[in-house]
């Protein structure tokens, strides 16, 4: 068998060295810039008393950091700007109530899941109509948060008079309570939490509605950042194994049975 040429050996050594340096660099990073939104409780929200972002995914980011040996610097970002901020390098990873979708995986990479949920249908508190799905809302004006998978869901149906988009769930619910829209679609656990906390008044979740967009909540990294993805996945496995993740979900009133 012919031995490897000197040129090939140098190229192979250089590639191996580059991979080792990349992995070592990821392991040496002591702090990450983490994108989170100010309006998505219980996943992420702005706590008025401390003037800081709090919630499930903030606790997850901190727990993952502790398990992985780094700190998480939370950066407040609008939901629609999370992925652009990540891909442009302003953020190192995203920790928010963002569902993994086929379209998003074309642009970014997702970690192992930390939770799973689907959409909820928000209606006026005095609306006693039957809503097993969205078809009863044909020719109505409905609302949805910009940048979410639920906009695509509504748009593909093509049955609505108008689809209005909002920067936050709070703005959307306010328009619903004022009668400006007939109904709205949003993150079921987010809306349920806000209603339990009496932060959303005059609205309710349609009790008979069955979600069709059930997805996984994950941490999100850039496509070219395999080393950070591996570091996060190892840390997620650790907080699942030792019960930390289950404790976080329980703290915020989420059903641990929905956890993948």
Where are these predicted regions, by residue range?
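Extracytoplasmic small-molecule ligand-binding "clamshell" domains
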Residues: 27-98, 106, 231, 242, ...
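Periplasmic-binding protein-like
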Residues: 38, 115-123, 196-233, 237, ...
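Extended ligand-binding regions for polar small-molecule ligands
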Residues: 55-68, 127-128, 135, 140-141, ...
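Short helix-initiation/N-cap motifs at beta->coil->alpha
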Residues: 58, 74-84, 129, 164-178
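A conserved helix-loop-strand patch within extracytoplasmic ligand-binding domains
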Residues: 70, 99, 112-158
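Alpha-to-beta junction loops
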Residues: 70-71, 88-96, 140-141, 177-190, ...
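Ligand-binding clefts/hinges and TM-proximal coupling segments of bilobed small-molecule sensing domains
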Residues: 71, 149-164, 202-205, 236-260
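A ligand-binding cleft/hinge motif common to bilobed small-molecule-binding domains
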Residues: 81, 97-106, 153-156, 182-213
